[in-house]
Structures are given as C-alpha cells and as structure tokens.
C-alpha cells in the first residue's frame, strides 16, 4: 500500500465538487472520514477559513477525532508549503483557530447559539444544562405528579379519569404516566411539538358517515388492504402458473376459482361498504384443493405450489380477517370516535405537561438538550427582525455546512440545519452518511430524511446531487461477498427502506490484503435438544457426570470459547493493517458483538473460566454485580427497613453473614408480619441464659447489624449521601472485603463508581437517600447502568460490546453473538403504539362492557412500526457484519439441525432473489440467524454441504461468497479445561507452597511496640482545623462544662471528629406538599430586612414594609415568607437603647461583618495536650456600633419565647447563644483593638433587647 492515499473517482468528486448541496452515501469502510477531512483541506486551499465551516458530528468523540485529523492534515500542508510565506501564514492562522472552530455535535452548536443570541427569544442566559437523563426523568416525574393532582381535581367532564382507566392498571396509573412521557419525547423530536400534539386526534376525526369513504380509510387503510391482496394475488398466480406447467389441471382450475374470488374482494376494497368487505373476507370460499398422492410423480410440484404459494396466501387472508375485520362498521366507527376523544384528551394533557415542565425548568434555571435545540430553532426561525438577522448572519458566516452521520438526524435537527444553510440551487450543505447504518431509531433518528433527499436529488438536479462511495477499504473480499449475499436477498425498499442493489452493494476495495490470509464466514449453531451420540461410552458417561451446559446461552458461549481457543492455538494468520504485516492472531484481534447487554455476565464468566482474557467495553451489567446489589439493598433498607427482599439480601450478605438456617430462625421466632419486625422481635425477646450457642451467635450478628443500621439511618438524615456511603464502606469493611474476591480490583472500582455517582447526583437538583434510590431504580428501568470505573485490562484480551457500541469501529475477527434472539417488539404491543410520522394508535376500553378492542388506527400504525423496526434490525445486522476485516462468525442456537434447516427452507417459497416480505416479517423467523439461514439455504454451496439434492435458487449459482455452517451439541463441547484448577487442587498447591516458605524469628518486643504505638497528636487528627461559630457556639451551652467534646476512640478504631453540625435539617422539597415557611427561612429573611433597612432616616412601618416588598419584587424573598415577617417587631429595635444609638450615629454602624479568628485548640477542646495547635473559627456578626467608650455588639435572634414563662425562656436563649456572642466579642476585640462595652441579643419574637453577661466575654478572651 502506498504511503500517500489515492482517492477513487467518486471520493475525488466528493472532495472537490462544490456549488450545490451534496449527499454522499458512504458504505461501510468507504473512508468517509478521510474524505471529510480532505474536503476541509481542499476548501481551505480555496481561501475559505476554518471559522467559515460548520462541521456537525453525531458524537463528541467523533468531533474530537475530526478536529485531530484536520490538525494533522494542516500540519502536513504547513510542512509542504515551505518557501511560501503567505501560504504558511494562512495555515498557521487555521491551526490557531482550529481549537475554537465549529466542529461539534449539533447539541453543542445549538448551545453556543443560545449563549450568544439568547436575547432574541428573551431567554434567561443563566441556566444549567440538564445533561443527566435520569435527573431529567426524576424532574419530569415530579412535575407530572403535581399536574396529575390538578387534572384529577378539575376533571369536570370525567374525560381524564377515562383516559387514566384506559391506559392504567387496577393498582396505579403508571401506564398513563408512561404514555405521557413517551408522547412528550416524540413531540420534542419534531420541529413544532405543539402542532404535532394538536394533530394527534386528526386521524380519528371521521369526515363521513361511512367508514370506507373517510379520509382515514382512503389514505391509510385502503392502500394497505390493496397491497396485501396484491401480494396474495401474486402468490396464487404463481401457483396457477406452476399447476398449468405441470399439467395439474384440477389444481389449476381450483386456484383460478380462488383468484376470481380474490378479484371480487379487491373490487369491494375500493367500494364504500365495510360490512360487505368484511362479509366477503369472513366467508371467503377457498374450497378444497384437490390432493395429489405422495406416490404420484407430480407430488413434488403439487407440494411446492401448495406450501410455497397457496398456503401462505390463505394464511395472509386469514390474518386480515382476524386482525382488521373483527368489528362491523358501527362498532369500528364507535371505537374510532371514542378513541379519538381519548387521544384528544391525551393531546391536551401532554400540552399541559409541556407547559408545566417548561415553567419548572425556568424556575430552576435549567434546560435539557431538547430545550436547547428548540430554542436554537426559535432563534433562527421565529417571525422577528432579530431572528432573520441572526439567520442571515450565520448563512453569511458559513461557506459550507458539513453533516456527518446524516442518516441519524431527526426532523428537528434537519430544520435547524436548513435554517442556516443556503437554499438550492446555491446550496452549501455537504451531508455524508449511510442509510444502511441508521440504527438509532430509539433516539428518534429518521432515516427517511436521507432517502427523501436521495429521491429528490435524483428527480431534480437543481436541488442537489448524490455521490455514492461503495468501495470497502476495510474488509477482505469474502466479507464483502458474504454481506452482499445476505442483503441482496434481505433488504429492499418495501421492508428495509432501501433497495440493496447496484451502488448500494459493497465493492471490494482493500486490495492490500495478501493471499496468505484467508477470510471466512461461518454460522455456529448450538443445538439445544440433540443428545450425545455415544451415551453408552464409558468416557462419555464419565464426562456427562462432571460436565453440564445449563442453558443455550452458556452453550453458545462455550462454543465460541472453544473456537477462540482453536484459532489462537492454530496461530491463525491475520493481516495487521497498522504494521502492514501478517502475524498470528491474538485475543486482542477478536471482538464479540451482542444485540443487547443481557448475556454479558455469562460471556465474561464462561470465557474467563476457559482462561480467555476478556474485557467488556460497555458492560452495563453494573447493577447485576454482587457488590452493587448488596450495597443498593443496604441503601434501600436504610431508607426503609420494612422491605423484606432487600433486608434478606443484606442479612445474607457478608456484611451481616447470616446463613439460611439463621435466617429461618428469625422467621420462626415470629411467623407473621414483615421480616424486619421478626428481626426486631428476636432481638428484644432474646433471653441470654435460655439461649443455645446457635441462638447466641445469631443474636450477636443481629444486634451488631441493628446498631449499624440505626447509625446509618441517623447519618442518612443528618449528612450527605456520600458521607453515608463512605461510612458504610469503613464501618462494614465491605470495600476491603470485595477486594479479596475474584476480580476484586474491578469490584472495588464498581463501589467507588457508586460513590462517585452519588456525589454527582447530589450536585443535581435532587437530594437525599430516598431520591437517590429512586434515581438508581430509574437508571435500571432505562437500562442505563452506571458503568463501573474501568480497571486497566490487558491489551491482549477479547473485547465484548454491543452492536450499537461497535458502530464506526473495525476488528479483524468478529463473532455476532445471540443471533437467534427474537427481535424486540415491545414498541408494537401494549395499549398503544406511537410513531413520529403516523401519530398514535390506541386500544379502546369500553367502560360498560369492559371489552378492550384495538382501533383501526392502532392496527395501521402498528404495521408501520413493525416494518420500521424490522428495517432497523436489518441495518443493525449490516453494521455487525461490516465491522469484520477478515473473519465473521454468526452464533446462535436451534433445537435440532433438522429444525433449523426446515425453518430456513421456507425461503424456497420466494420465487425472486429478495425473500418474500411475509417470510421476513414472520414472527418465528424474526432473528438474525434465521434471516441469514434463509439467505444461505438457497445457495448451491449450502445444498452441496448439508442437503444433497435440494432445490436451489438459480440467481445465486455464481455467487462468489464462501461460507460454512457448523452444528454443535453439548456432547461436542465436552468438559472444558480452563486455567483455574479445582478448589482441591488449588488448596493442595497452596499448602505445598506454604510449607516451603521460611520466615525469620519474630521479635516480640518490636511487635508490641508496633501494635501499641499511639500517634502523639491523635487528638489533632480528630479535630477539623476549621470551625464555624454556629458549630462552636455549643461550647458555652453548659456553664459547668465548657468543652465541645472529649476525644475517645471507638472499638473499631474510628474516631468521631471534633466538629459539631446541626441536626435540624429542613424537610426536603420533594417530601413537601403545601408547606409553610420554616422558622429558619423567616429568621434569615428578617435578618436581610434589617441589613437592607436605611438607618440614615428614622425607620417607619411603611419604610420597613417597603424594603420587604422590594425584596419580593427582586425575587429574593417569596411572598409566603414575606407575609410572615413582622415589621412592627423590627421597628421596635430602634426604640431600644442600642437602636437609639444606631440612629444617632448611623455612620458608626457595621452590619453583616464576616470575620475569621485563630484560637488555641485547647480553649475549645479540653483533651488537647499540644500547646501550639490552633483552630480557625469563622462567622458573620449581625451588627456592632463603635462609640468613644468602646464597641457595642448586638445579634438578632428569632427564637420562640415562651409567653407563659418568659424569664426562664429568655435565660435559656442567653445560655444557648452566650458562647456565640462571646466568640463575636473576642473577634471584635482583636479586630478593632477596642474594649467591648456591651453585648446584646435582640429577640425579634418579643421585640426586646437582652444583655449577655460580660464575664463570659472575659473568660474567653483572657
């Protein structure tokens, strides 16, 4: 291969052509990124600056890679431009501007747009990006909970109750909540969510009294019926032709009669009577096909026409009858009308939810990614001069807009790009992608945008031009041939949204591969029901006694593991593209691609058992790991111990260590009630002198656990979540314990990841343990695990990742795992189906009969979604196959070899190269393995290897692809020998090793010195060097004991630090309903008013109220808090002796004065022996007044004063805050150098000034 890359004619066209919009269809391995980078360089050579090009990528990683590649290319151009100073200066400028160039995801570009042009749409520029989807979901849940209550309360028509009943179960209304959230998500992917929601009921609006003359039937249902009947007619016509050719006259006549009946039904489809059409299909006269004996020489042809054409046609019509024609016209129209009422109510509810959610985000100053994109579109397109100016400015700025992975954009993103692009025929959009690799439908990606442009540019050259990059420079020829063999039979416009013909097929371009390297494509099929053939053999019997495959997933992985061992043992040659040389295959060359993450734990466990190093790049089984399940169970019972399953999990775990018998004892002790009550009852009713040793042991474990649980519950109420988690790790030793387990380093990394996730969670708008548990539950529901912190893995290890995760990557050897897994059809089931294009289709629950029936709108929408889902599955398979450079293995399972081949031979029903749509859609064949099997079974090479004399398809006779199909049983796998010995062998080896180890004699005196060592400054380690006054004030609460605490180590060696924190925490917002302002909030507000009040003039009630009103207007105070402030008590302060002095000398008043004071630690902690240890005390003084005689200190307090015993209550307040005032006084004395001539507490609750005894000041400051 030459050092300089030479471009193909189509690549060169994509690099240099300008003047209009360009759509580049770049197949897998076609070098699209290289083309993009080179196009940027060529554009720069024409004088366009890097700041004049907008490059939009699908991911941040892709943007970073693009920026890096452009930087490398620019440096190369700079190197070759030596001697041309002007050119060098230009390239240097581009390099300098590259870090701030517009190369990013579209989200990031929109965010920059908002930060720059927020004023165009009156957006508050101070906002936080709600990037965590789980936090976003929790916030939506809160908003929905509040809105739902309002909707119930104001449901005068009862329509909302009907909506709830229609979509929710008997226990809760979660079904409706899920529907609202999903509808909201679909709406947000459109350029105009409000309009999309408003149009949802439109398909249910019947504009005629006859169903078949309505717009819905004419536009949606009739075309579907016609296509189904045309397919049916085509099958019967093929059967008729086959019968005529073979001289089967009776059969031909029978099929002809059936065809006449089909023609009659087709006429009714275009008529106006639903009931007539329904009756014709329900009573369709198939008659009986004349039989042919199996001994007759014509039987094979008869069997072919019947099984390949006639029977499928009959099943197709039967499906229409049972699915679409259950109800008569009146019933169907009633269902549609009533369903339309519910859809209209849903539209109203989701619109209300959007409004409420937007308001809540505004209140919290947050935006999510959808908000950012919609706001960007509003900036560019709203009807205002400013918007038009911004759009024009951006169109002028960007000479070209490059969009990578265009097939994964949605309608909203398309609208944004269109708003800043030059319109055709001078278009400046350069879009590159491959519709065959569009696999993000679940993110609302719309591949039809790509296809629409393809068709548009083909029809109108002025609109733009299509360029196809078909050469695959990644894979060996057989990988290309095998992929083409599959997809030319599988993918077409009808079902795959693109015809896999001509330019869409892969063309071999990687001619640099040497002939010494072979390329293979193999099916590895594990047979679940085939028994060992040599069961009577003694060796087999011995093997079976020790070896067992528990399930098909384990069997598949063992099959793959042994294949990998074989490849490595054989030193299979591969071509190293980076080193440009042939070398033996290593584990690092092999990647396992999975359709989901479900079986990743099985894969890793089995491969490691075989001694195969493995790393899971996107494991996402984090919450399934033992250590995390135990920690989450513990957090659940700390939040609420009355949960049996989490409690049992913790008791059984190493944290407590109860076994099954001990757990049973607790339940036997109290057979009724929840398990936590049984645990408590056991502890409380325990009588030591009547207990057995077994019971004593259980009691010790349970008592210790309950003590820890109470301690953890206290921490959860008083401290941060991360403090709780770390305390659990320390107190239980669980973090250290898992480090000693297999894969201990990874397990510890997982626990650290939980801590870090809790830390980031608390930086969001949610707090507390309860919400964190909900947060994690939502992560699990979304299958969005916290992936544990990565542990450095060996470079030479097999990789495991999902197909989605592999997109854009390439590997020498690929195993496509779990290929027989049935496709997920959840989005086509349930009470409703939804599509961004066709809207929503629902089941209607009749409130009287309690019968639920699907609306015709649902059936049509479900059919469209089914086809879109199958098309996406085809694209996922295409992505998986095209990741391979030289070898690809498809791994799945079947019951038996005969069952597998029999299923695949249904492909013989297809007379054309592309398999019949009915076969590709068939539920029992809806998986990768059967799709591929059907594509291979018609190939002559398959028949030659596995099915002698079977029918093949002539169109595949010369196909160049080579492949192999292997069927494997559990007997074939046999017992596998991994690197791990049995427990007995391991212990024996460990014992032998230990026996050989010699140790020096122990110096017992030195050992005692080590064990008895006590750090001389132990007290300092338990004392924070920083104390706030609010923490230190308790120093003086007890006049007889002027100490905060006394150092004492616990039994575990843990030390309680010398620092006091408040135990009075505000009730979290999420637990409040209609809440009253807290006393602390009112107190803080009152302080603020006193701070803001102008004392240069005599205060009045009106002036005090004016300050309060202004603070409310500035949104510093809420109206509820403001109403609880008492202006007359504030005013009364200025009638006191100190208040009068303040008014007399306002320029000597100092308010809200912060201070920091270094104090000897011994003055705070009596157990300190060090004389030089100091503590920094920090606080804020409410106010002080300087006078010629000295300083007068005062502090406002809003504490309640007991009117029944006022003197005692005041005395208690003075004792409580005396220490705090004394600290203030000591600080002021040091700050001002003046004596303290008075110190007071002003009690706002009663409007009185109270003196603090002066001797306490002297005691501290001496």
Curated annotation (Swiss-Prot):
GO terms for cellular component: cytosol; DNA helicase complex. InterPro entries: AddA (IPR014152), DNA_helicase_UvrD-like_C (IPR014017), DNA_helicase_UvrD/REP (IPR000212), P-loop_NTPase (IPR027417), PDDEXK-like_dom_sf (IPR011604), Restrct_endonuc-II-like (IPR011335), UvrD-like_ATP-bd (IPR014016). Its EC number is 3.1.-.-, 5.6.2.4. ATP binds at residues 26-33. It comes from the Bacteria. Residues 5-476 form the UvrD-like helicase ATP-binding domain. Its cofactor is Mg(2+). GO terms for biological process: double-strand break repair via homologous recombination. SUPFAM superfamilies: P-loop containing nucleoside triphosphate hydrolases (SSF52540), Restriction endonuclease-like (SSF52980). Keywords: ATP-binding, DNA damage, DNA repair, DNA-binding, Exonuclease, Helicase, Hydrolase, Isomerase, Nuclease, Nucleotide-binding. GO terms for molecular function: 3'-5' DNA helicase activity; 3'-5' exonuclease activity; ATP binding; ATP hydrolysis activity; double-stranded DNA binding. It catalyses: Couples ATP hydrolysis with the unwinding of duplex DNA by translocating in the 3'-5' direction; ATP + H2O = ADP + phosphate + H(+). Residues 515-808 form the UvrD-like helicase C-terminal domain. Belongs to the helicase family. AddA subfamily. Heterodimer of AddA and AddB/RexB. The heterodimer acts as both an ATP-dependent DNA helicase and an ATP-dependent, dual-direction single-stranded exonuclease. Recognizes the chi site generating a DNA molecule suitable for the initiation of homologous recombination. The AddA nuclease domain is required for chi fragment generation; this subunit has the helicase and 3' -> 5' nuclease activities. This is ATP-dependent helicase/nuclease subunit A. The gene is addA.
């Amino acid at each position: 291969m030459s050092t300089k890359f030479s471009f193909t004619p189509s690549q060169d066209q994509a690099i240099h052509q300008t003047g209009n919009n360009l759509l580049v269809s770049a197949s897998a391995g076609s070098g699209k990124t290289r083309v993009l980078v080179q196009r940027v360089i060529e554009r720069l050579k024409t004088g366009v600056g890097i700041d004049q090009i907008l490059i939009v990528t699908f991911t941040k990683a892709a943007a970073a890679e693009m920026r890096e590649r452009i930087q490398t290319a620019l440096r190369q151009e700079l190197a070759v431009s030596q001697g041309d100073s002007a050119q060098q200066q230009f390239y240097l400028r581009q390099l300098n501007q590259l870090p701030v160039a517009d190369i990013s995801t579209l989200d990031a570009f929109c965010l920059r747009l908002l930060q720059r042009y927020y004023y165009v749409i009156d957006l508050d520029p101070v906002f936080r990006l709600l990037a965590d989807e789980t936090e976003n979901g929790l916030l939506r849940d809160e908003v929905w909970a509040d809105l739902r209550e309002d909707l119930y309360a104001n449901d005068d028509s009862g329509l909302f109750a009907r909506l709830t009943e229609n979509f929710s179960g008997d226990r809760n209304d979660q079904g409706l909540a899920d529907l609202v959230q999903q509808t909201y998500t679909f709406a947000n992917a459109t350029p105009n969510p409000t309009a999309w929601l408003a149009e949802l009921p439109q398909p249910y609006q019947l504009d005629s009294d006859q169903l078949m003359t309505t717009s819905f039937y004419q536009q949606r249902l009739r075309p579907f019926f016609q296509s189904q009947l045309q397919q049916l007619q085509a099958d019967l016509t093929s059967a008729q032709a086959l019968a005529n050719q073979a001289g089967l006259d009776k059969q031909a006549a029978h099929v002809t009669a059936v065809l006449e009946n089909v023609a009659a039904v087709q006429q009714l489809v275009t008529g106006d009577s639903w009931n007539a059409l329904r009756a014709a299909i329900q009573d369709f006269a198939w008659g009986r096909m004349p039989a042919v004996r199996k001994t007759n020489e014509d039987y094979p042809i008869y069997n072919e026409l019947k099984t390949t054409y006639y029977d499928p046609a009959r099943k197709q019509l039967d499906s229409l009858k049972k699915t679409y024609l259950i109800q008569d016209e009146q019933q169907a129209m009633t269902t549609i009308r009533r369903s339309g009422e519910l859809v209209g109510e849903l539209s109203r509810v989701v619109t209300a939810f959007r409004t409420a959610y937007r308001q809540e985000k505004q209140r919290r100053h947050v935006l999510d990614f959808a908000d950012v994109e919609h706001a960007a579109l509003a900036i560019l397109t709203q009807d205002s001069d400013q918007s038009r100016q911004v759009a024009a400015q951006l169109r002028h700025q960007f000479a070209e807009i490059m969009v990578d992975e265009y097939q994964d954009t949605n309608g909203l993103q398309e609208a944004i790009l269109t708003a800043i692009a030059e319109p055709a025929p001078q278009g400046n959009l350069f879009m590159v992608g491959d519709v065959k690799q569009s696999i993000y439908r679940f993110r609302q990606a719309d591949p039809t945008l790509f296809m629409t442009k393809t068709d548009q540019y083909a029809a109108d050259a002025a609109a733009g031009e299509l360029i196809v990059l078909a050469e695959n420079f990644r894979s060996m020829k057989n990988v290309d041939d095998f992929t083409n063999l599959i997809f030319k039979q599988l993918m077409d416009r009808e079902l795959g949204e693109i015809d896999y013909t001509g330019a869409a097929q892969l063309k071999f371009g990687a001619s640099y591969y040497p002939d010494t390297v072979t390329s293979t494509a193999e099916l590895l099929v594990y047979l679940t029901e085939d028994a060992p053939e040599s069961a009577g053999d003694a060796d087999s019997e011995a093997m079976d006694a020790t070896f067992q495959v528990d399930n098909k997933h384990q069997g598949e992985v063992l099959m793959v593991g042994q294949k990998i061992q074989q490849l490595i043992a054989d030193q299979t040659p591969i071509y190293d593209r980076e080193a440009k040389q042939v070398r033996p295959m290593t584990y690092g060359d092999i990647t396992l691609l999975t359709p989901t993450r479900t079986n990743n734990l099985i894969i890793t466990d089995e491969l490691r058992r075989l001694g195969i190093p493995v790393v899971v790049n996107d494991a996402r089984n984090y919450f399934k790991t033992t250590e995390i399940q135990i920690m989450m169970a513990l957090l659940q019972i700390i939040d609420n111990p009355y949960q049996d399953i989490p409690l049992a999990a913790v008791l059984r775990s190493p944290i407590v260590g109860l076994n099954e018998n001990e757990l049973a004892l607790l339940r036997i002790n109290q057979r009724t009630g929840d398990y936590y009550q049984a645990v408590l009852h056991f502890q409380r009713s325990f009588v030591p002198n009547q207990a057995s040793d077994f019971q004593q042991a259980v009691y010790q474990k349970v008592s210790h656990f309950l003590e820890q649980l109470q301690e953890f519950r206290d921490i959860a109420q008083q401290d941060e979540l991360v403090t709780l988690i770390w305390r659990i790790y320390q107190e239980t030793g669980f973090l250290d314990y898992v480090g000693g387990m297999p894969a201990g380093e990874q397990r510890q990394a997982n626990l650290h990841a939980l801590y870090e996730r809790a830390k980031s969670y608390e930086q969001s708008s949610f707090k507390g343990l309860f919400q964190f548990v909900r947060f994690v539950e939502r992560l699990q529901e979304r299958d969005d695990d916290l992936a544990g912190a990565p542990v450095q893995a060996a470079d030479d290890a097999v990789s495991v990742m999902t197909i989605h995760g592999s997109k854009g990557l390439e590997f020498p050897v690929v195993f496509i795992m779990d290929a027989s897994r049935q496709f997920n059809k959840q989005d086509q089931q349930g009470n409703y189906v939804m599509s961004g294009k066709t809207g929503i289709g629902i089941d209607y629950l009749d409130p009287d009969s309690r019968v639920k029936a699907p609306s015709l709108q649902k059936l049509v929408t479900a059919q469209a979604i089914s086809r879109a889902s199958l098309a996406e599955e085809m694209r996922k398979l295409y992505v998986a196959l095209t990741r391979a450079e030289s070898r690809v293995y498809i791994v799945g399972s079947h019951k038996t070899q005969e069952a597998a081949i029999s299923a695949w031979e249904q492909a013989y029903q297809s007379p054309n190269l592309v398999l019949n749509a009915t076969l590709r859609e068939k539920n029992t064949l809806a998986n990768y393995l059967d799709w591929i099997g059907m594509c291979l079974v018609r190939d002559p090479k398959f028949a030659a290897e596995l099915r002698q004399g079977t029918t093949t398809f002539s169109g595949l006779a010369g196909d160049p692809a080579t492949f192999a199909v292997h069927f494997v049983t559990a007997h074939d796998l046999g017992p596998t020998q991994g690197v791990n010995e049995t427990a007995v062998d391991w212990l024996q080896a460990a014992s032998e090793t230990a026996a050989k180890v010699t140790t020096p004699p122990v110096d017992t005196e030195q050992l005692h010195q080590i064990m008895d060592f006590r750090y001389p400054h132990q007290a300092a380690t338990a004392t924070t060097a920083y104390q706030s006054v609010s923490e230190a004030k308790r120093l003086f609460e007890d006049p007889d004991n002027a100490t905060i605490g006394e150092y004492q180590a616990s039994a575990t060696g843990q030390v309680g630090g010398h620092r006091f924190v408040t135990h009075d925490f505000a009730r979290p917002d999420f637990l409040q309903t209609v809440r009253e302002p807290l006393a602390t909030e009112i107190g803080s507000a009152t302080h603020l008013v006193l701070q803001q009040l102008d004392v240069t003039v005599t205060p009045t009630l009106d002036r005090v109220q004016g300050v309060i009103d202004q603070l409310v207007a500035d949104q510093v105070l809420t109206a509820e808090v403001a109403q609880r402030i008492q202006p007359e008590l504030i005013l009364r302060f200025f009638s006191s002796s100190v208040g009068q002095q303040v008014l007399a000398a306002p320029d000597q008043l100092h308010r809200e004065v912060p201070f920091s004071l270094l104090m000897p630690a011994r003055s705070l902690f009596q157990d300190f022996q060090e004389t030089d240890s100091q503590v920094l005390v920090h606080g804020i003084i409410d106010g002080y007044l300087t006078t010629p005689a000295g300083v007068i200190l005062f502090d406002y307090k809003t504490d309640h004063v007991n009117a029944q015993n006022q003197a005692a209550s005041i005395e208690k307040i003075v004792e409580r805050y005396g220490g705090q005032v004394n600290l203030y006084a000591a600080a002021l004395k040091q700050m001002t150098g003046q004596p303290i001539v008075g110190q007071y507490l002003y009690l706002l609750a009663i409007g009185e000034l109270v003196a603090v005894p002066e001797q306490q000041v002297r005691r501290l400051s001496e």
